[in-house]
């Protein structure tokens, strides 16, 4: 019999928050990439809805991606955010999880940390200092978030910016606050959806963000591959917790 290919499931918590560079890196690492749409485009302005999530045990890795909403929103916690938290608890017994921005905050909230509004947002390319560069390369990573987490009990912080925690490891779960997946194409989708002027309010322009991304994205793409390699070898490769 041939070798069974590992499967990674990317959860589209927002219709414009897709896997981009991160999906390419998982394919390069030998994974079949699958996706699941949590909030479809037609519900983006009314995102509270019940969702029946796939069985997490059918996958080797779950990747909950970003979203424009706060994970602590009451209407969302009563619907799909709460349902996704249940999925993550079930998955954590034997499946590796990589949470991205909103997805990382969801993991913090799921496993006993807190998520609240940060004193100031981080939007653009920020220097991230890593305490474990073989697992999580430091350097300039893209940010677009207004909230921040406190660590869940037992979690190990792996990275920070000057103002916020950026990554933690908890068993076979790795949470990231930044966006390793961003390339110019994905950024343009986000900028096209910037209806309320979040970028201008942060003191930047769309052109400035595009220019920064043109400068930093190629180096970030190389670090994304290293990040996925470290995640696959160090986190996915960990023994599952005993039942």
Annotate the PLM regions.
Residues 6, 60, 139:
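Nucleotide donor/acceptor-binding cores
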Residues 6-26, 37-39:
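N-terminal beta1-alpha1 ligand-phosphate binding loop
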Residues 10, 53, 116, 130-243:
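Amide-donor transfer/coupling interface in amidating biosynthetic enzymes
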Residues 20-21, 73-75, 107-110, 152-153, ...:
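Short glycine-/acidic-enriched loop or helix-start segments at secondary-structure transitions
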Residues 27, 31-98:
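Flexible gly/pro-rich beta->alpha loop and the following alpha-helix that scaffold active-site loops
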Residues 88-114:
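Catalytic nucleophile loop
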Residues 116-122:
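Short, electropositive alpha-helical surface patch
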């Amino acid at each position: 019999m041939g070798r069974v290919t590992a499967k990674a499931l990317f959860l589209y918590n927002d219709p414009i928050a897709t896997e981009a560079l991160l999906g390419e890196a998982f394919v390069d690492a030998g994974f079949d990439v699958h996706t699941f749409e949590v909030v479809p485009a037609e519900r983006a302005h009314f995102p509270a809805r019940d969702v029946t999530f796939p069985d997490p045990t059918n996958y080797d890795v779950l990747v909950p991606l970003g979203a424009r909403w706060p994970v602590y929103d009451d209407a969302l916690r009563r619907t799909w955010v709460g349902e996704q938290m249940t999925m993550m608890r079930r998955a954590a017994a034997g499946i590796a999880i990589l949470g991205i921005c909103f997805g990382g905050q969801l993991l913090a909230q799921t496993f006993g940390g807190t998520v609240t509004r940060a004193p100031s947002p981080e939007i653009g390319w920020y220097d991230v200092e890593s305490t474990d560069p073989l697992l999580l390369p430091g350097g300039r990573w893209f940010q677009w978030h207004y909230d921040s987490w406190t660590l869940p009990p037992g979690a190990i912080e792996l990275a920070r910016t000057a103002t916020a925690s950026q990554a933690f490891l908890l068993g076979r779960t790795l949470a990231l606050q930044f966006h390793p997946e961003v390339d110019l194409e994905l950024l343009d989708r986000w900028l096209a959806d910037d209806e309320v002027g979040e970028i201008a309010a942060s003191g930047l322009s769309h052109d400035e963000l595009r220019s920064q991304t043109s400068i930093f994205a190629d180096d970030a793409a190389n670090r994304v591959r290293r990040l996925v390699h470290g995640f696959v070898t160090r986190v996915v490769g960990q023994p599952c917790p005993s039942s």
